[in-house]
């Protein structure tokens, strides 16, 4: 899904990384709620002239039932889903490529507390030096990277710098370009 970006020249292109969060219980620190455990997706956009390619993906388990808690991982298209809070980061071409490389080569395994969608998006940001905040939150007696933690960290980021492009009003994620179709 990431090969699409090479179809647009990088000279004079604009590069954007977005984070979208579906909170488990919107506006709270609860790690389980109406939206189950919640979800965090990452969106990558490259624009040159009038051509834009956007891919929005999420990191998921392949298992079902209780096997979903710890299984092999998969990357799925996350375009066209509702989200509660989102953040936009304008990055360099070099940072963008590092994020693409990370997303295109995801960790082989998913674990609901040790390496989940929140940890994946945070890791992608770290790979490209994108200031996506650390989504670590309390889980029972321990800690883990969670969608609720990401939402809280984004709100904290916005409180510290009101000029950041963080949308607390939610909305619908635009559709992805899918398997490398330029529109």
What are these regions, as identified by a protein language model?
Residues 2-117, 126-183:
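Non-catalytic ligand/cofactor/substrate-binding and regulatory segments of enzyme domains
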Residues 121:
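Conserved catalytic core of nucleotide polymerization and phosphodiester-bond processing enzymes
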């Amino acid at each position: 899904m990431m090969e699409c970006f090479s179809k647009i020249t990088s000279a004079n292109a604009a590069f954007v990384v977005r984070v979208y969060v579906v909170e488990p219980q919107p506006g709270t620190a609860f790690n389980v709620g109406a939206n189950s455990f919640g979800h965090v997706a990452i969106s990558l956009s490259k624009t040159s002239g009038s051509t834009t390619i956007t891919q929005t993906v999420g990191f998921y388990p392949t298992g079902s039932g209780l096997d979903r808690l710890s299984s092999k991982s998969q990357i799925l298209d996350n375009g066209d889903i509702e989200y509660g809070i989102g953040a936009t980061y304008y990055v360099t071409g070099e940072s963008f490529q590092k994020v693409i490389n990370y997303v295109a080569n995801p960790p082989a395994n998913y674990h609901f507390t040790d390496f989940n969608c929140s940890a994946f998006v945070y890791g992608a940001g770290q790979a490209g030096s994108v200031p996506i905040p650390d989504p670590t939150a309390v889980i029972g007696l321990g800690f883990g990277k969670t969608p609720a933690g990401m939402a809280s960290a984004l709100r904290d980021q916005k409180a510290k710098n009101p000029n950041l492009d963080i949308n607390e009003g939610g909305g619908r994620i635009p559709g992805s370009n899918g398997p490398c179709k330029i529109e």
